Amino acid sequence: PDPFAESAALPVKSTASELVQRLGGIAEETSFSGGRGHSAEEGTAYHAFLQYADLGGEAEAELARMRREGLLSEEQFALLDADRLNAILSLPVLRGLRGKRVLREQTFLVQLTAREAGLADTDDRIVFQGAVDLLAETEEGWLLVDYKLSSHSDEQLRRDYAPQIALYKKAVAAAMRVSEHTVRARILN
């Protein structure tokens, strides 16, 4: 057997979604297709709203501001429901971030070993890039929030996206130069 076969099969550079697929998880690009009753376009519209929303705001006021500022397309506005948006904005995880340092659509380019990424039992390095929906600095450390629009249960989402969340936690820890133990993650469905 070739002693370097495992290393030779590893990518040198990859997107986070490609690595998640290699780990057997669900790729980020499909996360908003959500299945029963949720289109990819609908998920993308909610994601865009959350990218620009004031976490302390009311949905109607935020929608009006976003329309004035041209932040969303008319097609996206048509897919959004103000009551649902108010319910999202009132979730404890988002309410708790008011006044905190919040980074949205935070891109990263990090280097991990294949072992750290869970891809192979080798210390060969892999560079990968991706984007975190929301990252907030809290008293306990960094909180990573990943948006999903799905009719699946929270437990099912945790199972389906465990490889992605684990990889993103490692990426945040590496990018922010903190211990991975200080990075928490939440899926917001």
Residue ranges and their predicted role:
Residues 1-189:
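Structural signature of nuclease core domains in nucleic-acid processing machines
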